[in-house]
Amino acid sequence: MSGTAGTSRILRVYLDGPHGVGKSTTAEALVARCEPRRPIRSMLQEPMAYWRSTFASDAITEIYDTQHRLDSNEITAAEAGAFMTSLQLHMGTPYALLEEAMRPHVGRELAEPDDNGPLPQRRDFVLVVDRHAVASMVCYPLARFMMGCVSLRSVASLISHLPPPLPGTNLVVASLDFREHAARLRARARPGERLDLTMMAAIRNAYAMLANTSRYLLSGGDWRRDWGSLPVFKPSAFVARAAKTAYTLPLRDEPGLADTLFAALKVPEFLDARGYPRAAHAWTLDILANRIRALRVYTLDLTGPPEACAAAFRRLCAGLVLTEGSHPGALCELKRAAAAYAREMSVVGSREPTTAEVESA
């Protein structure tokens, strides 16, 4: 589908994945090499100011402390789950707000990734966002559920509040070898973080399941059709395996339902006597399927130095789907939203469009 003459062409890319794989460094390296000319490229870092200093407490530190207190038997699983659910909702809020700020200004998709013809080349604005709401609302809660830190009730509640993706939402899931991933986490040593290899294994599996879920759904997969073939998920078995091995669920070209996020969501408390989900849980699973199906999910291996990873990221971006602005002033409004997000939610400067760039849009 080609754009209308004169409409703005916008590329939005969300670089996501387990913490510590190097996604932020890769995105920053990509944007740093760009000259300040059209297309304007803006990098929105994780909203650390919102998470760590906007309110009275530091959410990052609270998350690690809660997990540590649970592991030390200082609090119960129910208490930890209540804390974690609140914190995950807080972590996802900036992304949900950004989506709603952009929603009126994002129009139709200009090309499908599987088009036979060339993708549109002109890009007026390239927006790279460090993470997407799916991280805080799906992947991290699910990883903590697999570790026994939050209940499926909490996971279901968060999934049900995942915002509908905007057209042209390109989600790039970064990955890395397990040992290199652990080494990078040890090296970065962010304030408040605790190295937890079991949690690292859980979040790696959650993101692999996310990528497999997208492939499963886009190839015609139907969770209702395949539900009967799934075994009941046992978090304790997952934790025992993750604690002993560096196993990560493989990314599959033709995944089955057992390779997807749905595999961790079949637990007895939400099933009827036949083993099928009760209505409310089924609706939650439908929301998950609809949200993930609407995303354009890609994977990117970040093995190697930042410059090489940035080059691989650039090559991937060349084939991603674009959208057009929904009205003549859309490009200016999107730049303003990006600038406000960077200014108020990031600790250090994401590259904001300058005043001159915004006014010239």
From Swiss-Prot:
One of its GO terms (biological process) is DNA biosynthetic process. This is Thymidine kinase. Pfam families: Herpes_TK. It comes from Saimiriine herpesvirus 1 (strain MV-5-4-PSL) (SaHV-1). Keywords: ATP-binding, DNA synthesis, Early protein, Kinase, Nucleotide-binding, Transferase. Homodimer. The active site is at E46. It catalyses: thymidine + ATP = dTMP + ADP + H(+). One of its GO terms (molecular function) is ATP binding. The keyword Transferase applies. Belongs to the herpesviridae thymidine kinase family. Substrate binds at Y64, Q88, R190. Catalyzes the transfer of the gamma-phospho group of ATP to thymidine to generate dTMP in the salvage pathway of pyrimidine synthesis. The dTMP serves as a substrate for DNA polymerase during viral DNA replication. Allows the virus to be reactivated and to grow in non-proliferative cells lacking a high concentration of phosphorylated nucleic acid precursors. ATP binds at G17, P18, H19, G20, V21, G22, K23, S24, R184. SUPFAM superfamilies: P-loop containing nucleoside triphosphate hydrolases. Disulfide bonds: none annotated. The keyword Cytoplasm does not apply. Its EC number is 2.7.1.21.
